[in-house]
Amino acid sequence: MNTLKDNFYQDWRVFDIIHWGENLLLSNGFNDAKQEIEWMLCDLLKFKRSDIYANIGERISKSNVTDLKEWINQRIKNKPVQYITGKTEFYGHEISVSPHVLIPRPETERLVDVAIDTIKNLSNPKVLEVGTGSGCISIAIGSAKKDANILSLDISAAALKVAKMNTKKNNISNVKFEKLDFLRSIPKGEYDLVISNPPYISKYEIKKIMLDVRKYEPEIALTDNNDGLKFYRRFCDNVKKLIKKRGSLILEVGIGSHPMRAFEIFYSSGFKKIELIPDYNGDLRVLKIEI
């Protein structure tokens, strides 16, 4: 394995560090090496992607080189780039992330699309999110639907701290947070929309997922330590207490057989207005139930 002691340059240009970093990451098995080194470099130098090649011959300060080398070293140890830089983008918003919260995924933007479309014609809709994490879902909905009143729940105080920071950073004022264990209790009130990206990886599958996910992302946000359906049963049992008549429940689902297994939980309980919605790759990733 190559290490950061190899190929130490005394004088670095943008080109040099892209070339060196890309080769180092490639040699350590990272297939998206160029994209990742550009991502880190943009964050470090406060560049937009287009700025990189407009400044390809510019020299980089010694302190920035030192920082970037440390970041690459962390990446070689499989730490996700988003945790290294401390942020990512979701639905056009910059979202701070830490190992206390799940890294927002592009496929979850489809969940937000469906939610916004569902409540777009409602006045002052009440929205409940279960599983705040970084707050990205509530922030995206709250930004798009400014008259919505959103309550976002999480069992983790550390996650809620990150989410509150993100709402402040994105100037979102219509989201409130509450610490609550949804598997043990439910919030008061009725909502026009309940939305969640719950832990849906089973205790068997969690052992097989990518190392950078398994090693660094919070297990509580990934798996229910059961069959991956515990939260869906909990929603099914309580949905009529939580949602107004003609309201909706929107849930992200996993891959493989998981979407149909989640669908069956609600169908076998008598719910008829159920829809599985594909993401932009054509995979069924959103489950919508109308009450």
Model-derived features: positions:
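Conserved AdoMet
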Residues: 42-117
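Conserved beta-strand segments of alpha/beta enzyme cores
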Residues: 94, 149, 174-176, 272-275
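A short N-terminal interaction module
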Residues: 2-4, 8-60, 64, 68
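Conserved Class I SAM-dependent methyltransferase catalytic core
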Residues: 226-289
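Residue-level signal for inorganic ion chemistry
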Residues: 40, 78, 108, 137, ...
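Conserved SAM/SAH cofactor-binding pocket of Class I
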Residues: 107-208, 256
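Conserved hydrophobic residues forming the short capping helix/wall of the S-adenosyl-L-methionine
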Residues: 25, 119, 167, 239, ...
